[in-house]
Amino acid sequence: MKTPKRAALALVCAAFLAAFAPLSVPGTALAESGAAETGLGPVTSMPLPRFVSLKASEGNARRGPGLSHRIDWVFRHRDMPLLITAEFENWRRVEDRDGQGGWIHYTLLSGVRTVTVTAELAELHDSPEADSPVTAKADAGVIGRLGTCQPDWCRIAAGGEKGWVRKSDIWGVMPGEVRE
């Protein structure tokens, strides 16, 4: 039977461990979070969140940052855009346009910017104006390389065609992002 002193000491020890154990144990939820949702990444000092693309034709998204973690999702499209939301050592937490994702090794990612067409049928225009001539059309799911962006329009290249598309018709660029 425990004495009141031992019970109090056990309670204090349990509270201490609960409060500070996540700070010092690799692989815990705090360590795996990688960073806050916005700001600079703790590993690269690059902005978070930010867009990248899948360098490989296949990439495993894991439950946590490390090979010992279970694979939750497999990305199977080279050049698909992904959103990095956190960093931990050589791992990046990413998600696709549907919110699917997990932790992926940084060597499978590229800084080359791409976008996915989200509209059922997106029109590529000659210039960033709604009344400019349509040069091509792209179906939903088409992946294109991102070029210049204005507040509401981006120039993309896909399937040998180039043109300006409304930002609302693509995923892989921040709403107010401007690129030159």
Task: Provide a role label for each language-model segment.
Residues 29-63, 74-78, 85-88, 92-100, ...:
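SH3-family beta-barrel domains
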Residues 8, 16, 134-136:
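Generic detector of solvent-exposed, compositionally biased contiguous segments
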Residues 1-5:
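N-terminal secretory signal peptides that target proteins for export/translocation
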